[in-house]
Design a protein with these regions (language model features):
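Glycine-rich "substrate-gating" loop/helix at the edge of Rossmann-like oxidoreductase active sites
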Residues: 135-137, 166-175, 192-205
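N-terminal Rossmann NAD(P)H-binding glycine-rich loop of SDR-like oxidoreductase domains
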Residues: 3-25
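Glycine/proline-rich active-site loop of Rossmann-fold NAD(P)-dependent oxidoreductases
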Residues: 156-158, 170-181, 214-224, 246-248
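Conserved Rossmann-fold NAD(P)-dependent oxidoreductase catalytic core, especially the SDR/UDP-sugar
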Residues: 70, 74, 82-138
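NAD(P)H-binding glycine-rich loop region in Rossmannoid oxidoreductase-like domains
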Residues: 34-91, 99
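Active-site Tyr-X1-5-Lys
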Residues: 135-161
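Mid/C-terminal beta-alpha module of Rossmann-like enzyme folds, strongest
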Residues: 210-280, 299, 307-358
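A conserved pocket-lining segment of Rossmann-fold NAD(P)-dependent short-chain dehydrogenase/reductase
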Residues: 131, 181-202, 206, 210
Length: 358
């Protein structure tokens, strides 16, 4: 099957391309001109350049495709205006649905986010029916994206299925997404802070498999949470410390101290022109529980691995990149789980490379 993936060089997109190739798809990878293509290096996917905000380029890329995965997005809490986020999310999705219609594709799988299901002040688990209650620009853009996508798909008779990943961790994240940055930030934090609240951690490899299942079995008009374990932040940080042989959390920051620290980080970032370790938008999430059930996706055959495996995958890959500097790397003592994860990642890449050379 010929399949189009937008945002193919991103964290989710690059892992999705690999999953599709393994399952015999003829993949067309849609990326912007001058994109960083390291995450697609050596793969047999056809690279097509364009922009989701340019309908003709997207329609041309979709020509001859039976299935479209729309993973293109701006996932950032820094240096993007609310209008920028919403424009790419909403208009880009409308254009993707219209491109599928023009190409005669039967289905679009939209990469949404679990944040469209809101969060809770207490440790309770939400699901696909939970109401949206977030106020940050990124979350608002994702909720608007879903609404616009489902509406346009209904008008054109396109089968649209939305998948809502939790906090994705893993490999091929060269631009460093906010999710993997959480791990790096803890390692770089000299005070080893943790904070109240929690989130749902999931391996991006499992999220990629969940996309494939949604494309095969998902019900049109439905959304599916692609998550794994729900954990509190102190437990997550202790797990990172254990996996990488560093200090466990030394104290718990509250909402106010987190917000002030993030404001200081943003000021430093504006002077150094380097992304901050945290932002005020992220600090507002302190104390909230982003916990979700993936029971509906389980009906499709979705079986994610534990959060520890997701963290081990991410740690193994990040240690091989400049995201973790040499000095910091030398201070760490990775566990056997991290080394084992690296061996698996290497074996998977070698298998893909062998397939490409066959």
């Amino acid at each position: 099957m010929r399949t189009l993936v937008t945002g193919a060089n991103g964290l989710v997109g690059a892992n999705l391309v690999r999953e599709l190739l393994v399952h015999g798809h003829e993949v067309r990878a849609f990326v912007r001109q001058n994109s960083d293509l390291r995450s697609l290096k050596g793969l047999t996917a056809e690279t097509v350049f364009g922009d989701v905000l340019q309908p003709d380029s997207l329609a041309g890329a979709a020509e001859g495709c039976e299935l479209l995965f729309h993973a293109a997005a701006v996932f950032s809490y820094w240096k993007h205006t609310p209008d920028d986020l919403k424009k790419v999310a909403v208009q880009g999705t409308i254009n993707a649905v219209q491109a599928a219609y023009r190409a005669g594709a039967r289905r679009v799988v939209l990469t949404s986010s679990s944040v469209v299901l809101g969060s809770s002040a207490r440790p309770q688990v939400r699901d696909e029916k939970s109401p949206f209650n977030e106020t940050d620009a990124y979350s608002i853009s994702k909720a608007a994206q879903e609404e616009a996508g489902f509406a346009r798909a209904a008008q054109l008779g396109i089968e649209l299925v939305a998948v809502c990943p939790g906090m994705c961790l893993g490999q091929h994240d060269y631009r460093l997404s906010p999710s993997n940055a959480i791990l790096c930030s803890y390692l770089k934090d000299p005070w080893k802070q943790t904070w109240p609240g929690g989130c749902n951690l999931v391996s991006v490899r499992d999220v990629a498999r969940g996309h494939l299942l949604a494309g095969q079995k998902g019900k049109p008009g439905q959304r599916y949470v692609l998550g794994s374990e729900n954990l509190e932040w102190p437990a997550i940080h202790r797990m990172i410390a254990e996996l990488l042989g560093t200090s466990e959390p030394k104290f718990t920051a509250n909402h106010t101290s987190s917000y002030l620290a993030a404001a200081a980080q943003e000021l430093i970032a504006s002077l150094t022109r380097q992304p901050p370790l945290s932002t005020r938008a992220q600090a507002k999430m302190v104390g909230r529980y982003y916990w979700y059930s993936h029971a509906r996706a389980a009906d499709l055959g979705y079986k994610p691995r534990p959060a520890r495996a997701a963290l081990a995958d991410a740690a193994a890959w990040l240690l091989s990149t400049p995201h973790i500097g040499m000095q910091l790397r030398a201070s760490l003592t990775p566990s056997r789980d991290v080394y084992a994860a690296w061996e698996v990642l290497q074996a998977e890449e070698e298998r893909l490379q062998s397939h490409a050379n066959a």
